[in-house]
A protein has these predicted regions:
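A structured, charge-rich N-terminal accessory region that forms the first stable segment of a protein
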Residues: 2-136, 142, 147, 293, ...
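Intrinsically disordered, low-complexity basic tails/linkers immediately adjacent to helix-turn-helix/homeobox/MYB/SANT
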Residues: 289-305
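Residues immediately within or flanking Cys/His clusters that coordinate Zn2+
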Residues: 125-128, 150-153, 164, 185
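Hydrophobic micro-packing sites on short alpha-helices
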Residues: 283-289
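Short linker/helix segments within small regulatory modules
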Residues: 143-151, 178-185
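Residue-level signal for the short linker/turn that defines the boundary of a DNA-recognition helix
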Residues: 252-254, 279-282
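Recognition helix of helix-turn-helix/homeodomain-like DNA-binding domains
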Residues: 263-279, 301-304
C-alpha cells in the first residue's frame, strides 16, 4: 500500500514495535484558511500508533537521509508550528517518506527568511467552540488549525467570535497548555470538560466596526496560509531592498515615521537591514494595515514592482 511505511527500529529505543505499519493520515483543511498545523497532524499520527509525540518525532528525525544533521541530544521539542531546526528536520524527513504532500506549508517555515520567530506562537492553546461543535456534528476529527497557534490571532473569522483560551467549567477555568500531549484536543486537559458548545459557555461575538485591527489580522493570516504554497517568499539578500522600497514608496523616505508606524526603533531597523534580525509578524501586519496592502501583496510589491 502506498500510504504505509515499514518502520525498522529497536523496540528498546522507541515505543514502536520491532516491525510496525506506519499509516499516513490525511491532513485536514488543506487549501483553506483552517489548514491543520503540522504539530496537530503529528499528534493525531502518534495517537493512531499509540505512541507519544516525542517518540514519533524522535523516530522521524532518525529517518532523515542526511545523518550529519541529526541532533546529538535525545529530546526533540516540537510543540509549535514554527521555524526551529527541529521542525525543519521533521519536514524534510516527512518529505522523504512521502507520507504527506508539502508538510512545510503546514508550518511557518516558508516565512523564515522574512519573519521573526520570537513571540510568534502562544504558550497556551486557543480555539473556536463553534468550530469544534461543527466538526463533531459533521463527523470531522477535531484538530488545531495552523492559525490558532499564532499569538496575534484572537478571533475566528469563520464564525465572527473571539477565540477561547480557558475551560468554561466554572470549577476549572484552566488554560490549555501547548506543551500538553493530551488527546483528544477538544476536551479540557484538567477536568475533561467538552470545549465546544456547552451550558457554561459564553460566546463573545466580534463587532467588526470596533475591532477593525483584529479583523484585519484574522483575514490576513487566513489568506497567508491559503496562498502559502504559491507565495514568492523573498530570499535573505532581497529583504534589504524590499524594506528600502517600502520606506521610499509608502513613507517618502522617512525612516523615523516608518519605524514609528511598525513599532520598532531605528537601531533595530539597521540590524534588520544587515540581516541580524527579522521583522516581527506584528510589524509586518502593522505595515500591511497602514498601507492597506494584504500581507502577501507587500512582498509581491517589493519583488515585482
Amino acid at each position: 500500500m502506498n500510504n504505509i511505511k515499514i518502520f525498522e527500529e529497536k523496540q528498546a529505543a522507541y515505543s514502536f514495535s520491532k516491525r510496525s505499519e506506519f499509516y499516513a493520515l490525511e491532513p485536514i483543511g488543506i487549501g483553506t484558511n483552517r489548514v491543520e498545523g503540522l504539530v496537530s497532524y503529528l499528534r493525531r499520527l502518534a495517537d493512531a500508533h499509540n505512541v507519544t509525540l516525542h517518540a514519533l518525532v524522535s523516530y522521524i528525525i532518525k529517518l532523515h537521509p542526511n545523518q550529519s544533521v541529526h541532533p546529538k541530544h535525545t529530546y526533540y521539542p516540537i510543540l509549535r508550528n514554527g521555524m526551529s531546526k527541529t521542525m525543519g528536520l521533521v519536514v524534510e524527513s516527512l518529505e522523504e517518506l512521502r507520507l504527506i504532500t508539502n508538510p512545510k506549508n503546514m508550518t511557518m517555515l516558508p516565512w523564515e527568511n522574512v519573519m521573526s520567530y520570537s513571540k510568534l506562537f502562544t504558550k497556551e492553546k486557543k480555539w473556536c467552540p463553534i468550530c469544534l461543535e461543527e466538526w463533531k456534528n459533521n463527523g470531522i476529527k477535531c484538530y488545531e488549525p495552523l492559525v490558532w497557534g499564532i499569538n496575534l490571532l484572537n478571533i475566528c473569522s469563520q464564525h465572527n467570535v473571539k477565540l477561547h483560551q480557558f475551560c468554561s467549567n466554572v470549577e476549572c477555568r484552566a488554560s490549555q497548555s501547548s506543551h500538553h500531549e493530551k488527546l483528544p484536543i477538544e476536551y479540557c486537559q484538567i477536568c475533561n470538560q467538552w470545549l465546544g458548545i456547552n451550558k457554561n459557555l459564553e460566546l463573545k461575538f466580534v463587532n467588526k466596526d470596533i475591532e477593525k485591527w483584529n479583523v484585519w489580522v484574522a483575514d490576513n493570516l487566513g489568506e497567508m496560509v491559503i496562498k502559502i504554497s504559491n507565495l514568492k517568499i523573498p530570499k535573505n539578500n532581497q529583504v534589504y531592498c524590499i524594506i528600502d522600497k517600502w520606506i521610499q514608496d509608502f513613507f517618502q523616505g522617512d525612516r523615523r515615521r516608518f519605524c514609528y508606524e511598525i513599532q520598532i526603533d531605528n537601531n533595530r531597523l539597521q540590524l534588520i537591514e544587515r540581516g541580524k534580525y527579522r521583522l516581527s509578524l506584528n510589524s509586518l501586519l502593522l505595515l500591511s494595515y497602514r498601507t492597506k496592502l494584504k500581507l502577501n501583496d507587500l512582498f509581491y510589491y517589493g519583488i515585482e514592482s
